[in-house]
């Protein structure tokens, strides 16, 4: 690692580590209400009705609505990359959710809307995605040029159709350990993986 990048990394960690540790120690309430900085890693959650994840044996992930995410001008060189990232969003989300989830529930991706009992539906809207800057990631060191994604995710009881909770979350990925800072597509994928892991943590909290 370059000396300048190492110095930046040390300074950033010294600043954010205590705050991150403190945030991770906060209890995660499951009573109805709207909470910011909930649990260890959630920006905002609105709990409409509490539930127990062990009461469900199946989780259906529906395709994310990507039509709300702003697109760059078609002349921009990363227009195609953004379109590809949005098209792959649900697939990437599944890749991140399944391995992280501790609950004993089968996870499937489907566009249908089941009315089955003991089934949760995960659906959401991609609010924004940004590839960041590969040059920034390569030359700027830790955190610079990071890609990002933001989504609003609903957790729904399939049988009743009622929304149980709404999570608003943004994630960044800096491609720190990728050669050349990682391609734009790679780091956007990483940000979606991180988002999906966050949703797994939310589900596992409701016990």
Where are these regions (language model features)?
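N-terminal export/membrane-targeting signals
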Residues: 1-22
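Short alpha-helical segments and helix-capping/turn motifs at coil-helix boundaries
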Residues: 7, 44-46, 108
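A structural "domain/chain start" motif
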Residues: 21-95, 114, 201-207
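Surface-exposed short loop/turn segments
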Residues: 23-36, 103-104, 109-162, 174-182
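Short connector loops/turns at beta-strand edges and beta->alpha or beta->beta junctions
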Residues: 65-70, 129-131, 170-174
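Short secondary-structure boundary motifs at beta->alpha junctions and helix caps
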Residues: 76-83, 144-147, 156-205
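Sec-exported extracytoplasmic/periplasmic mature domains
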Residues: 94-106, 131, 172, 200-207
């Amino acid at each position: 690692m370059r000396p300048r990048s190492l110095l930046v990394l040390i300074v950033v960690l010294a600043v954010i580590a205590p705050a991150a540790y403190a945030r991770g120690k906060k209890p995660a309430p499951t009573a109805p209400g709207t909470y910011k900085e909930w649990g260890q890693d959630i920006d905002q959650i609105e709990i409409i009705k509490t539930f127990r994840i062990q009461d469900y044996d199946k989780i259906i992930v529906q395709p994310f609505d990507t039509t709300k995410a702003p697109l760059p001008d078609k002349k921009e060189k990363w227009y195609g990359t953004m379109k590809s990232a949005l098209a792959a969003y649900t697939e990437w989300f599944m890749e991140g959710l399944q391995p992280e989830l501790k609950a004993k529930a089968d996870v499937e991706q489907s566009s249908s809307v089941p009315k089955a009992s003991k089934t949760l539906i995960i659906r959401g809207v991609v609010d924004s995605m940004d590839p960041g800057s590969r040059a920034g990631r390569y030359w700027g060191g830790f955190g610079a040029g990071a890609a990002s994604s933001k989504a609003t995710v609903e957790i729904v009881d399939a049988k009743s159709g009622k929304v149980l909770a709404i999570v608003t979350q943004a994630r960044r990925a800096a491609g720190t350990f990728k050669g050349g800072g990682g391609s734009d597509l790679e780091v956007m994928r990483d940000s979606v993986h991180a988002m999906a892991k966050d949703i797994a943590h939310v589900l596992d909290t409701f016990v």
